Amino acid sequence: QDIRNQGIELTETFETPIFCYPGDTCIDVMQREEIARRAQILFIELTFLDDRVSPESARRHGHIHIKDIIDNEELFADNQTIVFMHFSSRYKPDQIHRILQDKLPDSLRSKCHFIPNTNIFGSSTDPTDLSQIAVMHAQSTQ
């Protein structure tokens, strides 16, 4: 009580972004934007998963390659849930799952999910209920 009467601040406010979706972008968004690094839930593109397209070519065309994610894993340390999306149509959902399991480092694998591409009519080869992302996040933070 004496400290408060002296006008000394006893509380500190912290702002934590809950959700971030940087859109169709390169890995530099994670290097440049603190809000993306601090977001509890990050939706981010991951267009290329193998050597058919190089990381350099992916960046030149405004996309992210899995090597960019792996080489910059420390940028995702504060994200509690990461949802990859915007995959090249060359990848089927089962391939995406297998490649992510095989290539992602342990520090990322447990908090990563993916949404497969859908066609213009809204159907998907692996239907995903987006509301489940919030459920997965809630379960992972308990």
Model regions and ranges:
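Active-site-proximal loop/turn and secondary-structure-junction residues that shape catalytic pockets
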Residues: 48, 88-89, 118
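Short, structured coil segments at secondary-structure junctions
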Residues: 38, 107-110
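Metal-dependent phosphodiesterase/nuclease catalytic metal-binding core
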Residues: 1-84, 94-103, 124-142
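Canonical P-loop GTPase G-domain recognition
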Residues: 109-120
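Short, active-site-adjacent cap segments at secondary-structure transitions
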Residues: 90-92, 121-122
